[in-house]
């Protein structure tokens, strides 16, 4: 993990499986069967409806880096592969003026203390998928292979998101079996 020196931070990143989904915001004419309601990542009380159809997912992301927009706020610069760029171009060319949602998809694990059949207390871990909106912005131009996501919070949060997206090429979750610290020696 380039730029990560702290083993705890590296474990946190490797243990997460993050992805993105780009979807158009549902409008009043969208059938209830073709839309889903999601919370915003930064505000659980704010929700929006997005179409169920995924335009592009994070597996099409070839690069993600951080930067700052014209107002000095953090942003994540995204580069898609050619297939992802074509899909994004097709979806946005007919939807200028509509809002495009960016969902942050994260696989999480929750631990729960349960009693097994022998009457013993054991910790049971359950994996679940959490999807939250990180951006819902108006499409102002046709998007292609390169664009940016704004409204991602602090520079540190933008940096973590970009790192997770680059590391998100890991299509399956990782579990730690063994941990060692290796350092340089003579």
Outline where the language-model segments fall:
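Extracytoplasmic/secreted envelope proteins and their assembly/folding machinery
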Residues: 7-14, 158-162, 183
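Extended, hydrophilic extramembrane loops/domains of integral membrane proteins
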Residues: 143-179
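Non-transmembrane, solvent-exposed regions of membrane trafficking/translocation machinery
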Residues: 1-138, 147
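Conserved structured catalytic cores and adjacent interaction surfaces
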Residues: 179-186
